[in-house]
Amino acid sequence: MDVRNCSFCGKSIEPASGFLYVRKDGSVLNFCSRKCKENMVKLKRVPRKVKWTNEYHRIKAMTKKA
C-alpha cells in the first residue's frame, strides 16, 4: 500500500484518491483535494504562509521554541 503526502498541506493520501499533477519540467505533485491543487498551482500560494497547512504549523512550532 503506497500512502503519499499532499504536496501542499502535507496530509496523507490514500491509494486511488486525490490528484496527480505533472508540471512541464517533469516534477510530480500529489494533492489530496481540489482546494490544495488550486492554492498551489493556480493561486501560487506558499504552504508555509497558509495557516491550515502542516508546514505552517511546523515552522510556527520551531519559532516558538526559539
Curated annotation (Swiss-Prot):
GO annotation, cellular component aspect: ribonucleoprotein complex; ribosome
MF terms (GO), sorted A to Z: rRNA binding; structural constituent of ribosome; zinc ion binding
SUPFAM superfamilies assigned to the protein according to its UniProt record, in alphabetical order: Glucocorticoid receptor-like (DNA-binding domain) (SSF57716)
Pfam families, sorted: Ribosomal_L24e (PF01246)
Domain of life from the UniProt record: Archaea
Annotated disulfide bonds: none
Gene3D superfamilies, per the entry: Ribosomal protein L24e
Zinc finger (C4-type): 6-36
The record's free-text note on cofactor binding: Binds 1 zinc ion per subunit.
GO biological process, one term: translation
Residue sites binding Zn(2+) per the record: C6, C9, C32, C36
Cofactor: Zn(2+)
Keywords: Metal-binding, Ribonucleoprotein, Ribosomal protein, RNA-binding, rRNA-binding, Zinc, Zinc-finger
Ribonucleoprotein listed as a keyword: yes
Presence of the UniProt keyword Transferase in the record: no
Function: Binds to the 23S rRNA.
Complex and partners: Part of the 50S ribosomal subunit. Forms a cluster with proteins L3 and L14.
Family: Belongs to the eukaryotic ribosomal protein eL24 family.
NCBIfam families documented for this protein: PRK14891.1-1 (NF034186)
Protein name: Large ribosomal subunit protein eL24
Species this protein is from: Picrophilus torridus (strain ATCC 700027 / DSM 9790 / JCM 10055 / NBRC 100828 / KAW 2/3)
Gene this chain is encoded by: rpl24e
